[in-house]
A protein has these predicted regions:
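Catalytic loop of short-chain dehydrogenase/reductase
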Residues: 122-150, 155-156, 160-163
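N-terminal Rossmann NAD(P)H-binding glycine-rich loop of SDR-like oxidoreductase domains
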Residues: 10, 18
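Conserved NAD(P)H cofactor-binding loop of Rossmann-fold oxidoreductase domains
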Residues: 78-83
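The beta1-alpha1 cofactor-binding region of Rossmann-like NAD(H)/NADP(H)-dependent oxidoreductases
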Residues: 49-60, 92
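Conserved Rossmann-fold SDR core element
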Residues: 152, 161-177, 212-218
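Substrate-binding pocket helix/loop in short-chain dehydrogenase/reductase
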Residues: 86-87, 94-96
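C-terminal helical subdomain
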Residues: 171, 187-225
């Protein structure tokens, strides 16, 4: 059974990821700002309250890994922060708040986990179709979509930098999934796929995708958005 870190586990896809991985017998370190009741009491899930926007808060993860796991088989960078605001009203502070979670949080957590990653480990970053060059873009998502483009490039670079160690880095760029975040970005829109359905795909990819992919971006979308 594998040791897997999942971020953004308080709701939506992240919550489903933690539950589905645990149901398969894997050990999950569930990271979110608030800890949901649904994850408490599960013997395969350990929860940490961590704000990815604050680098110092991530020391909790480092402490846990050094004292408990000693090895990380996979990371799913699922946590995300969204801002829906016209570009003309989007300040540098707004951009920074989004990037602190969506980009810096990914980079900092990966760096902390690096000593525990090994040959065969798989780091999966959940991006968005909005971060794909040439994809359909939507007004008001400048900070969010550009941050999702940034982590795509980051993952490609890390795949190259750590290929000799046998650590795989891949990105899943998701289309519309019925989550609270989608409702915030596109009020009233009904997505064709549920959080549980998408989580199942991500779980399968995390466990097996590194056998076939490294440094790749897979577009997981059947609709626009």
């Amino acid at each position: 059974m594998k040791n897997i870190i999942v971020t953004g586990t308080s709701r939506g896809i992240g919550l489903e990821l933690a539950l589905q991985l645990a149901a398969k017998g894997h050990h999950v370190l569930a990271i979110s700002r608030s800890i949901p009741q649904a994850l408490l009491g599960n013997e395969n899930i350990s929860c940490l309250s961590v704000d990815l926007a604050h680098e110092s808060d991530l020391q909790k993860v480092g402490d846990y890994l050094s004292s408990t796991w000693k090895q990380v088989d996979a990371i799913i960078h699922n946590a995300g922060s969204l801002l829906l605001k016209p570009f003309s009203e989007t300040s540098q502070t707004d951009f920074e708040s989004i990037y602190k979670v969506n980009v810096f949080g990914v980079a900092n957590l990966t760096r902390i986990a690096l000593p525990y990653l090994q040959k065969g480990s798989h780091v999966v970053t959940i991006s968005s179709m909005g971060g794909i060059q040439g994809s359909l873009k939507f007004p008001g998502l400048a900070a969010y979509s550009s941050s999702k483009g940034a982590v795509i490039t980051l993952s490609e670079l890390l795949a190259e930098e750590y290929k000799e160690q046998g650590i795989a880095f891949n990105v899943l760029a998701l289309g519309a999934v019925q989550t609270e975040m989608l409702a915030e970005a596109f009020p009233g829109y009904q997505a064709p796929i549920s959080a549980a359905e998408m989580a199942k795909y991500i779980v399968d990819f995390t466990l097996t995708g590194n056998q076939y992919y490294n440094g790749k971006v897979l577009e997981v979308s059947s609709s626009n958005p």
